[in-house]
Amino acid sequence: MSSDNTVAPKRKLKPARKQVASDEVDKSQGYQAGREYNIWYNKWAGGDREDALASKVHSQTRCIISRDAGYTRADATGNKYCCLFFARGCCPYGYECQYLHRLPLPSHQLPDNSRDCFGREKHADYRDDMGGVGSFNRQNRTLYIGKIQESPDKKQMTETLLRHFGEWGKIVKYNILFGRGVAFVTYETDHQASFAKEAMANQSMDGDEILNVRWATEDPNPGEKVAEEKRIEEIGQKAIAGMLDENLVEATQAVRALEDGDVEDFYHIETSKPEEEEENRPAKKGKSEGGFFNADALDNIKFYAELAKKQAEEEKEKARKVPAKQVGMSLLGGYGSGDESD
């Protein structure tokens, strides 16, 4: 029996793909000019100086979200961090991995804000070359992209940049410096920027270049600074509002409306018919001056207080004007001269 209302089948989640085999990736490291490895800045220090950009090697693997993303053991265990090797396209575990194999969503919340989306600890300051994990003192959403192989057509270059970097998240702003091979890309969240930085490091777009992807320095434009501060303030307000109880928020708004005299803004109050007021009663309508009683209520209280005081004074005045009874004359009234017995 067929029914008209057909329900679309639910899309099954696919397991994460094993991007590489454990023996496919060349794990040999290049020549390190440094003598000591600085665990704080995650780089070598000391030794001979060399051009770090000239010694870069093209990455052997690359992540393709539509093909590699899927569920892993982290979806069952509740781990909120993404897999760093998945972003680089070289995770051999696939669905058996203990980390997430997907892009961080805009609503993605991490248990520790001092770590990036991969679980790596951030530092107080950026590295001198603006590489590495980043800083926890600033929410950076902008990436610096260097060594871009430019195209004669500017529109084609813009399309190529947005196609390759738009795969890792929503791009809210971008700027291409034509003639310099440099571009700046701003993502919606810092988690997306961190993921894109690792995914596109030492990669190439449509050419054979090796991209230099770093964190961007702070924008010196005053307008951008004000907009960023406003955005962070709005995010904080939404986060605080999400943790508050709705009944508590409504009660607070009601109390504030009573204090400000703007009750009509929250509750619809029907206009009542004007009542006949006493001749001596002042009819004043004033705005609230703070507190639980507005100007009208205070005038009413003052009026009734003065009225009660006036009535009390009138009672005292009446008590003073009443004459006292003559006791002597009332005693003599019993001895009348018209009595026959006398």
UniProtKB/Swiss-Prot annotation:
Protein's UniProt keywords contain Flavoprotein: no
ZnF C3H1-type: positions: 77-104
Any single GO BP term: spliceosomal snRNP assembly
GO molecular function, one term: zinc ion binding
Key words, A-Z: Cell cycle, Metal-binding, mRNA processing, mRNA splicing, Nucleus, RNA-binding, Spliceosome, Zinc, Zinc-finger
Biased composition (Basic and acidic residues): 270-288
CDD domains: RRM_cwf2
Record domain RRM: where: 141-218
Main location: nucleus
UniProt KW Metal-binding keyword: yes
Gene3D superfamilies in the cross-refs: 3.30.70.330
SMART domains, alphabetized: RRM
Disordered, as annotated region: 1-27, 270-292
Free-text comment about domains: The C-terminal RRM domain and the zinc finger motif are necessary for RNA-binding.
Oligomer and partners: Associated with the spliceosome.
Cited function: Involved in the first step of pre-mRNA splicing. Required for cell growth and cell cycle control. Plays a role in the levels of the U1, U4, U5 and U6 snRNAs and the maintenance of the U4/U6 snRNA complex. May provide the link between the 'nineteen complex' NTC spliceosome protein complex and the spliceosome through the U6 snRNA. Associates predominantly with U6 snRNAs in assembled active spliceosomes. Binds directly to the internal stem-loop (ISL) domain of the U6 snRNA and to the pre-mRNA intron near the 5' splice site during the activation and catalytic phases of the spliceosome cycle.
Family: Belongs to the RRM CWC2 family.
Protein name: Pre-mRNA-splicing factor CWC2
